[in-house]
Amino acid sequence: MREIGKSKIEYPDTYIVIDIETTGLDPETERLIEVAAIKYVNHKEVARFSELINPLRDQLPADLLDKDKTIYISDFIENLTGISNSMLHDARGEKDVLKEYIKFIGNDMIIGHNVRFDISFIYDALLKDYGVLFQNDYIDTLKIARKLLHEDLKRFRLKDLADHYHIDYSHAHRAVNDCEITHDVYEKMMEDIFNNFGTIENYRKKRKNKKQKG
């Protein structure tokens, strides 16, 4: 069992929005192909990190990796993300990229959409590559949306939330673009909470009362 950080509903001054792209859905068998993070201080961007990862760089000798023949990802993932096999060929390996990525993130609060998915991949990779645990506390925009917007929406994909808040989604499915969209969605949801409940604590109490009545 992964010993991850705690799920929060907060509005911190400093946080990191993260997103990843992978070869598939299972962190035990699939690999990272892109990681991104944007740091916000006082809710304004101050820095960003974005890099592709060659998922075989750390697994095979360089002379076995052929730019024209080596298959790193499926056609489905290529079509979904716009990341091609040729783009991944020249990328660095997971260990090198993750070392810089986790240094960029530091101990800050993490925000992401369905962020447990991202955390699971990063957690497993860091444990495998460096023997360290990834335990930052996190805010999941999916979790907030399911409670906050359940009367307005039937689905809570990032696209659904972007459409609901009239946020441009045309460049989605690259990691850093998804970070930007997730940040904008998060800020809009926090605005809704403050407008409708006054404070996050009032929102928590309202949710708690609904659970007890339900």
Predicted regions: what is each one?
Residues 1-10, 164, 183-214:
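Acidic two-metal-ion nuclease catalytic site recognized across multiple nuclease folds
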Residues 97, 181-182:
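Short Asp/Glu-rich motifs
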Residues 178:
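Conserved catalytic/binding loops enriched for acidic/polar residues
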Residues 137-140, 200-202:
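Beta-strand segments within the central parallel beta-sheet cores of soluble alpha/beta enzyme folds
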Residues 2-123, 128, 132-136, 155-167, ...:
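Conserved non-catalytic scaffold segment of RNase H-like nuclease domains
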Residues 138-154:
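Short alpha-helix plus adjacent loop in nuclease-associated cores
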